[in-house]
Amino acid sequence: MANYNVYFSPTGTTERVVKHMGESFGSMENIDLSRRDMKNHEMEQGDFCIVGVPSFGGRVPGIATERLRKIKGDRTPAFLLVTYGGRAYEDTLVELKDVFEAQGFVCIGAAAIVAEHSIAHQIEAGRPSAQDYDELDTFAAEVKERLKGNACPVEVPGNRPYKEYKVLPMDIQVSDECMGCGSCVESCPVGAIPFEDPKMTNGEVCISCMRCVEVCPQSARSGNPEKVQMISEKLKMICQPDKANEFF
């Protein structure tokens, strides 16, 4: 029997949440969906898997869906986890469930965890909080009990067909602080930054995941300030503060 943490986590939040959940289940192997060199994986019926993704506009990020299809289960129990920046996760959980069930997994639990927005950081700033992690610990205990029996597949909210998947171009900008170290080139989940010119970003390939901004040691990369401001103002109007996590 083996336990796995599976995550797509451009800015690190989803990875932290998944790994925190995994601490309740002992030793875990990690599978990082953001790696372009990700290998195929096969899991057995006696294994257990926690899979987490951020919600991108109410959907599973497209590249995460592609890489989840490299993982095969054999009626392997799985826990689904979605992080979102305080607006809504819409069809993300149900899409994640559909994708993973099609790969041979039985989804015995799920959670939608509120997190600091990866672009408009003032939205749900500081989350997940200590209280959020306490809630996750409490639910992890319930999931452990479910694993002892013949747990039924969980139902999660969302619509089929899913809402249209859209990528909001962030027009990533690079300042003169860039040293050409290549951290962004290596880390980009979709290979949108050319090695020979790391100050460039291929806007047709970029998924606006903000990973390059997060990993830059010089803080030289940023989203277009006008677009960041526009997103921030819109979210301030539509997001309710201190949104509750949801567990299923």
Where are each of the predicted segments found?
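FMN-binding flavodoxin-like domain, especially the glycine-rich phosphate-binding loop
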Residues: 2-17, 21-169, 225-248
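Short hydrophobic alpha-helical module
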Residues: 139-146, 181, 187-191
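Charged, low-complexity surface patches
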Residues: 88-89, 177, 205
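Iron-sulfur cluster-binding cysteine motifs and their immediate structural context
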Residues: 174, 183-207, 211-228
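Short secondary-structure boundary micro-motifs
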Residues: 156, 161, 176-177, 189
